[in-house]
């Protein structure tokens, strides 16, 4: 599982209301959610994000209320993965359940600039920064979690397993 994309940086304590404002929770349509993804944190994000881009954030990303809408919005916006110093535990679980790859890195936020291109190798646990000589390490995603992501989330994974 390898991703290359442009970095969008967000600070600490980005809550689920900043990821997808509550006023848009009347739909589960991924494209409708994508149109408003991160707009309270950066009003230009939904218009400027491109497929494959990567969100890099500070501590406690995804805190606040539990809602599956948040990882759905991020994924539907075209973001390939999210890397943060830390995640709220409920967001961490929801992200994998919805098939959104996420990684924790204590170092990346302070070493990368918004707009910089990075490559994330989730299998080997390496992040390469454009123009940097030294790679950063991350914890690789365990094989079972990689299966969830490859299948598009927990429900699709269970449906595939039940079909046998």
Curated annotation (Swiss-Prot):
UniProt pathway: Amino-acid biosynthesis; L-leucine biosynthesis; L-leucine from 3-methyl-2-oxobutanoate: step 2/4
InterPro entries: Aconitase/3IPM_dehydase_swvl, AconitaseA/IPMdHydase_ssu_swvl, IPMI_Swivel, LeuD, LeuD_type2/HacB/DmdB
Record carries keyword Lyase: yes
GO molecular function, one term: 3-isopropylmalate dehydratase activity
Gene3D superfamilies the UniProt entry points to: Aconitase, domain 4
EC number of the protein: 4.2.1.33
One Pfam family matching this protein: Aconitase_C
BP terms from Gene Ontology: L-leucine biosynthetic process
Keywords from the UniProt entry: Amino-acid biosynthesis, Branched-chain amino acid biosynthesis, Leucine biosynthesis, Lyase
Top-level EC class as recorded in UniProt: lyase
Keyword Lyase recorded: yes
Record field: catalytic activity: (2R,3S)-3-isopropylmalate = (2S)-2-isopropylmalate
CDD domains listed in its UniProt record: IPMI_Swivel
PANTHER family (UniProt xref): 3-ISOPROPYLMALATE DEHYDRATASE SMALL SUBUNIT 1 (PTHR43345:SF2), 3-ISOPROPYLMALATE DEHYDRATASE SMALL SUBUNIT 2-RELATED-RELATED (PTHR43345)
Function, as annotated: Catalyzes the isomerization between 2-isopropylmalate and 3-isopropylmalate, via the formation of 2-isopropylmaleate.
Quaternary organization: Heterodimer of LeuC and LeuD.
Family: Belongs to the LeuD family. LeuD type 2 subfamily.
Protein name per Swiss-Prot or TrEMBL: 3-isopropylmalate dehydratase small subunit
Native source organism of the sequence: Syntrophus aciditrophicus (strain SB)
Organism ancestry: Bacteria, Pseudomonadati, Thermodesulfobacteriota, Syntrophia, Syntrophales
